[in-house]
A protein has these predicted regions:
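A short, N-terminal "cap"/entry segment at the start of jelly-roll beta-barrel domains
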Residues: 1-42, 55, 88, 134-138
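Double-stranded beta-helix
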Residues: 3, 9-12, 23, 82, ...
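Short loop/turn positions at the edges of beta-strands in beta-sheet-rich folds
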Residues: 37, 50, 60-62, 69, ...
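Conserved short histidine dyad/triad with adjacent acidic residue
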Residues: 44-60
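Short beta-strand His + acidic residue motifs that chelate non-heme Fe in jelly-roll/DSBH
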Residues: 54-56, 75-76, 98, 104-110
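Glycine- and acidic-residue-biased ligand/ion/polar-headgroup-sensing regions
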Residues: 61-80
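Short acidic-glycine-tyrosine-enriched beta hairpin
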Residues: 80-99
């Protein structure tokens, strides 16, 4: 039975690809899945459960764009791991730019799943990445 959900787990990278980013993000139930990975850019989709978080991280050589497609969140960033002096609330449609070399974390502050689109330049995850849970990502 087809429920109408986007269930294909495929990285469409290296081919032209058109997608409604909000729609495919909302239909994603994996912690992280690479939706498109090129040579210089990557888009992943994430699903963060209520009260969950991405986890504090830094990417020394990768800029990021993070866009909330469903839910609400808080993003914290800073140059030092122990001093995240930038804090903003995010809701559907909001985007945050994370410069390379910046510590950051996104926490789900809503009651439902947080659906997020991540764009990395250059790509950060291996082509075809599928991580069903946060534990799979660690």
């Amino acid at each position: 039975m087809n429920c109408g959900c986007h269930t294909e787990q495929r990285d469409f990278g290296l081919h032209p690809y058109v997608a409604n980013m909000e729609q495919i993000a909302v239909q994603n139930y994996h912690f992280r899945i690479a939706a498109w990975t090129g040579d210089y850019l990557q888009m992943t989709l994430m699903c963060i459960p209520a009260c969950g978080e991405i986890g504090l991280e830094i990417h020394e050589d990768t800029d990021q764009l993070i866009r909330v497609e469903q839910g609400c969140a808080v993003v914290k960033m800073g140059k030092c791991k122990d001093n995240l002096d930038f804090c903003r609330s995010l809701r559907r449609g909001d985007a945050v730019f994370v410069p390379a070399g910046t510590w950051h974390n996104v926490s789900n502050t809503g009651r439902g799943a947080l659906k997020v689109t991540y764009v990395y330049a250059p790509p950060h995850h291996p082509r075809g990445t599928v991580q069903h849970t946060k534990a799979d990502a660690e």
